Amino acid sequence: MTEYITVGAEDRVEARSNTIKLHGPDGFEGMRRAGRLAAEILDALVPHVVPGVTTQEIDDIVYRMTLDGGGVPATLGYRGYTKSCCTSINHVVCHGIPSDKALKDGDIVNIDVTPILDGWHGDTSRMFLVGDVALKARKLVDVTYECLMLGLAQAKPGNRLGDISHAIQSHAEKHRNGVVRDFCGHGLGRLFHDSPEVVHAGRPGTGPELKPGMFFTVEPMINIGRPDCKMLDDGWTAVTRDRSLSAQFEHSIGITETGHEVFTKSAKGLDKPPY
């Protein structure tokens, strides 16, 4: 097993503000670099997410790639979390902890990474299909990715956060899926979690107005069944209460003068992730 180093405690103090920060060109450049590293890590995982591989082995790869890229994993040591990524399998909604559990044929798994590079956080997650996956699971993954992209289409100056939320909720519920309310997107940049909170269900025309320089994540969690979640005893892992399948995609973005920039988009120019 990899011998991990962690970010010092002085880097773990987060003074989240109720004020939404507006960033300039230096912030955009910092987020581009951090986001590029995050996307490269997920791209590199594709051939490794196969039956028989353990989520701990995946975590080891994420750790090594983050350090090799000049960064450190934001999650490692964060509020006592001991891993470099989150691996959420099947009915796990988010924050699944890597372990010696091996992936099985037919699993769907979300891998969530956040490298810190030069003080900036690149937060992103993607679904991976393991072997031969059932049609209903593939459909859930497709719908969840569509929810993310429809939400991002509303990310432009003059719109409001509720426009993003409504686009996601409308598409998910059109397909009779549940939108998780217990977790949300968040502002980020120099901090891992900052204002605003970005919920994934809501009414159009509500919430803070989007302005150039705002940085935040959009990360819908969509369930085949009901949206309700429960926490496991480890204090991190959230699962669907009805044990239905759950999927999630996440991008970090910045609002520009004319729309938005996706910091964590793959450089491979894919229309959708290679799942």
State where each predicted segment sits.
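Active-site neighborhoods and metal-handling regions in enzymes and metal-associated proteins
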Residues: 1-275
